[in-house]
Amino acid sequence: FQAYAHLLDARILRALADNKFGTPTPVQRESLQNSLGGAARDILARARTGSGKTLAYGLPILQKIVATKQGIPKSSTEYSATRALVLVPSRELAEQATRQLNDVLTYCKDMVRVANLARPVKSSVQKLLLSERPDVVVATPSRALASMQAGDLVVRDSLQSLVIDETDLVLSYGYGTDVKTILQEGFLSRSHQTFLMSATLDDDTEALRELMLKDPVVLRL
């Protein structure tokens, strides 16, 4: 990853080295080049399970947050805001994504916080967690939508990045309606970068692509 020192914060690079992430996988390499280098493009990536899709979206979204917060005084009300929403199909995948994102944030944890809404906690605990405006929220679509409808998860003015991880599973598990509601009911900022990550590109995923993505880079790896 040292070849991407011009794109990634030194603290992120150090954490990658500590966690033995040496050479980027093809999907990570292509995503970094197209989402951070030059014009920040939307990404549609088809890559098999185990190909490194979490870091393929995780590194760009975390880098954008770190870069943004470096220019905001900690005393400002704009400093704490949810800037990335990661939608996943299951609690297990939420745990995996949260763990890997936190690994990358080893040296930035005083600056960037990740909240996992898929964990089975009381609603009062979840409300408190969201009231602190974590930088990244990882959730199933149903949990994210419920939190938005309750007014607890607010990203309309702050969202930089939207991710649907394992899109084919998100849709096959029946979350399609929740995803479309999140997209169409005014919960999101008008301008944000979107990552659709999937092991397969079936008709349902292609339909979601048309709804979500603007001039995307399509990676078939």
Language-model features, listed with the residues they occupy:
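Phosphate-binding Walker
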Residues: 26, 54-59, 91, 207
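Conserved nucleic-acid-binding Ia/Ib motif block in the N-terminal RecA-like helicase ATPase lobe
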Residues: 21, 70-150, 158-161
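The conserved Walker
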Residues: 47-51
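Walker A/P-loop NTP-binding motif
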Residues: 29-41, 54-78, 100-105, 184-185
